[in-house]
Amino acid sequence: MTTYALVGASEFNSEQFSARNGAGAFDAVIAVDGGFTSLADVGCAPDLAIGDFDSLGYVPEGVEVLVFPPEKDASDMELALGEAVARGADAVEVYGALGGRLDHTLANLQLLASFAEHGLTVTAMGERERSEERRVGKE
């Protein structure tokens, strides 16, 4: 199973992420816009940074970057999930997508469920919460 970690700009369970990353659980790590700061804070350089970078305020350097315009039909998290799938991920752990603004949390949960319906196993990890969406037809 190819597992990616996506890190967004919301509350971030850095201890859990660092433990999983240190154990080699992820084949790749993607920073989603402001999630780049969260990763920098724990000393992790992502394999890819993706987004319009309105939350971060600058385009990161020193890593592969996919920049999108602020006016778009998909959220940065949706673009990151799509990119993970395009690169071969069949499982994704999402950090920094729960907590914070309720509208963003609900939108992310709907987004994760949508990707699970299309074959991706998705787990969202918050500071105090966890949501797991399994691939349709699996377990």
Each model region followed by its residue ranges:
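Conserved small/polar residues in nucleotide/adenosyl-binding loops
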Residues: 133-139
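N-terminal beta-strand-loop-alpha-helix module at the start
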Residues: 1-58
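Short Gly/Thr/Asp-enriched flexible loops that form oxyanion-binding sites at enzyme active sites
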Residues: 103-113
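Short, acidic/small-residue loops that bind anionic groups at enzyme active sites
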Residues: 114-130
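Short phosphate-binding loop-to-helix
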Residues: 65-87
